[in-house]
UniProtKB/Swiss-Prot annotation:
This is UPF0597 protein YhaM. Disulfide bonds: none annotated. It comes from the Bacteria. The gene is yhaM. PANTHER family: UPF0597 PROTEIN YHAM.
Length: 436
C-alpha cells in the first residue's frame, strides 16, 4: 500500500519491524514448545495420550520458572500439554489464546498421570530448539522448531515426513526481512523515523495498546512479584516521589509483572520476547504522555525504540547469558531521547551510557524476577537520557564503551556472542542443580 510512497530501504526496515514485533501470549520459550506440541497434535485424529519433548539448554533455562497463562502452573510440561490439548497451531506466539478451561483441566490431568516428559536435547548445537512428539494410540506426530520461536523446520508422523525446511533453508535466510539490519546504522534508522509517512508506521501503535493494557493489569492484580503495584503503594506512603522517573519504573514493572505472572493478555513482543517488547514500549509511552505527544509522535518514537532494539539484538544470539531487557531498554532510551530532544548525538550518548551501565546483567532464565531486570533497565535508560540531555555520557575512555556508538554496540554484542557462552553454561548448570 505504501511502497510507492517510500524508498526501498524504508520498506525493508518496516518489514523487519513487522517480523520482530508481534503479539505473544505467555513467555515465548514455553510458548515455542506449546506451538510444537499443538502442531504435532494437529497431525493426529485421535485423543492425545502422551507427549515426549526435547529442548535446548537455553530454552530449558527460560522455561523452568515461568507461569503459563491460564494455568497457574510453572514450566515446560504444562506448556506442552496445553499446547497439544488446547492450542491453535496457526496462531504462532498466541498458540494458547483460545485454550478452554476444559483443555487446561485435561492438560493438568495428563501431567498428573505422568504422561508428559520434557528432556534436554543432547547433543544440541542450536540455541533455540524445541521438539514435541505427541502420541495417540498407535499413531504419533513429531514437530521440531529451530532458530526462532515459531520456525517449524520438520513435521513427521508414523506414516512418514510431512514437511522439512532443510532443502530451502539457505534461500529463506537470504530472504529474511532482518538481512537489512546488517547493512544499516542507527543514524539511518533515525533518518527513516523522521521522514517515513505516518500511515506506513501507524501499526506500531498496537504495541502501546497491548503493552499498556498489560501495565494496567499489573497494577490492578497481584501478578508475579507485583513490583509495580508495590512501588505504587510506596508512592502513597511518601517513600517514592510521584514523578516521571517513578512513573516509568512503576508502569514498566507492572507490565512485566502481569506478563511473567501468567496474565491472559498478549504482550507485543520484540525479537521474540514479551519483556523486550514491554521494555521498548512502556517507558516511551510514559514520556510521550508527559510531553503531550500526539499519535504520530508516539508512533515515530516507538518505531525508533523498537527498531533500535531489533538492530542491537540482531547482533546477539537469539538467547544468551546477556539479559536482553538491557538491549531493549537501549531502544527505549533512543525513543525517549527523540521525544525530548530529537538529536542523533543525544540518542547515541544515551545508548553509550546504557552500555557502560547495565551491560553485565545476566539472563538466569525467564521467571517473575524478570520484572526486576525490566524495571532496572527502564530506570537506567531514563537516567542515560537525562545525562545525554546535558551532553554527558560514558565515554570511549571507559570500559567497553568506544568513541562511537556503533563500535560500543559491537563490543557489547561480541561479549555475548563469545565470552559469555561459558557464563551461560554455568548459569544452566546452577539452575539444573536446583531442580534436582
Amino acid at each position: 500500500m505504501f511502497e510507492s510512497k517510500i524508498n526501498p530501504l524504508w520498506q525493508r526496515l518496516i518489514l523487519a519491524v513487522q517480523e520482530e514485533v508481534k503479539p505473544a501470549l505467555g513467555c515465548t520459550e514455553p510458548i515455542s514448545l506449546a506451538l510444537a506440541a499443538a502442531a504435532a497434535a494437529a497431525e493426529l485424529d485421535g485423543t492425545v495420550e502422551r507427549i515426549d519433548a526435547w529442548v535446548s539448554p537455553n530454552l530449558m533455562k527460560n522455561g523452568m520458572g515461568v507461569t503459563v497463562p491460564g494455568t497457574g502452573m510453572v514450566g515446560l510440561p504444562i506448556a506442552a500439554a496445553l499446547g497439544a490439548l488446547g492450542g491453535d497451531a496457526k496462531a504462532g506466539l498466541e498458540v494458547l489464546k483460545d485454550a478452554s478451561a476444559k483443555a487446561v483441566a485435561d492438560a493438568k490431568a495428563l501431567l498428573a498421570a505422568g504422561h508428559v516428559a520434557v528432556m534436554l536435547q543432547e547433543p544440541c548445537n542450536d540455541i533455540l530448539f524445541s521438539r514435541a512428539k505427541v502420541y495417540s494410540g498407535d499413531s504419533w506426530a513429531c514437530v521440531t522448531i529451530v532458530g526462532d520461536h515459531t520456525n517449524i523446520v520438520r513435521i513427521e508422523t508414523d506414516k512418514g515426513v510431512v514437511f522439512t525446511q532443510a532443502d530451502n533453508a539457505q534461500e529463506e535466510e537470504k530472504a529474511s526481512p532482518l538481512v537489512v539490519l546488517s547493512h544499516t546504522s542507527l543514524e539511518e534508522i533515525l533518518a527513516f523515523v523522521n521522514a517515513v509517512p505516518f500511515d506506513a508506521i501507524r501499526f506500531i501503535l498496537d504495541a502501546a495498546r497491548l503493552n499498556g493494557a498489560l501495565s494496567q493489569e499489573g497494577l490492578r492484580g497481584s501478578w508475579g512479584l507485583h513490583i509495580g503495584s508495590t512501588l505504587a503503594k510506596q508512592c502513597d506512603r511518601g517513600l517514592l516521589a510521584k514523578d516521571l522517573s517513578t512513573s516509568i519504573l512503576i508502569r514498566t514493572s507492572a507490565a512485566s509483572d502481569a506478563r511473567m505472572g501468567g496474565a491472559t493478555l498478549p504482550a507485543m513482543s520484540n525479537s521474540g520476547s514479551g519483556n523486550q517488547g514491554i521494555t521498548a514500549t512502556v517507558p516511551v509511552m510514559v514520556v510521550a504522555e508527559h510531553v503531550g505527544a500526539d499519535d504520530e509522535r508516539l508512533a515515530r518514537a516507538l518505531m525508533l525504540s523498537h527498531l533500535s532494539a531489533i538492530y542491537i539484538h540482531h547482533q546477539l544470539p537469539r538467547l544468551s547469558a546477556l539479559c536482553a531487557a538491557t538491549t531493549a531498554a537501549m531502544g527505549a532510551a533512543a525513543g525517549m531521547a527523540w521525544l525530548i530532544d530529537g538529536r542523533y548525538a543525544t540518542i547515541a550518548m544515551a545508548i553509550s551510557s546504557m552500555i557502560g551501565d547495565v551491560s553485565g546483567m545476566i539472563c538466569d532464565g525467564a521467571s517473575n524476577s524478570c520484572a526486576m531486570k525490566v524495571s532496572t533497565s527502564a530506570s537506567a535508560a531514563w537516567k542515560a537520557v537525562l545525562m545525554a540531555l546535558d551532553d554527558t555520557a560514558v565515554t570511549g575512555n571507559e570500559g567497553i564503551v568506544a568513541h562511537n556508538v556503533e563500535e560500543s554496540i559491537s563490543n557489547l554484542c561480541s561479549l555475548a556472542c563469545r565470552s559469555m557462552q561459558q557464563t551461560d553454561k554455568q548459569i544452566i548448570e546452577i539452575m539444573a542443580s536446583k531442580a534436582h
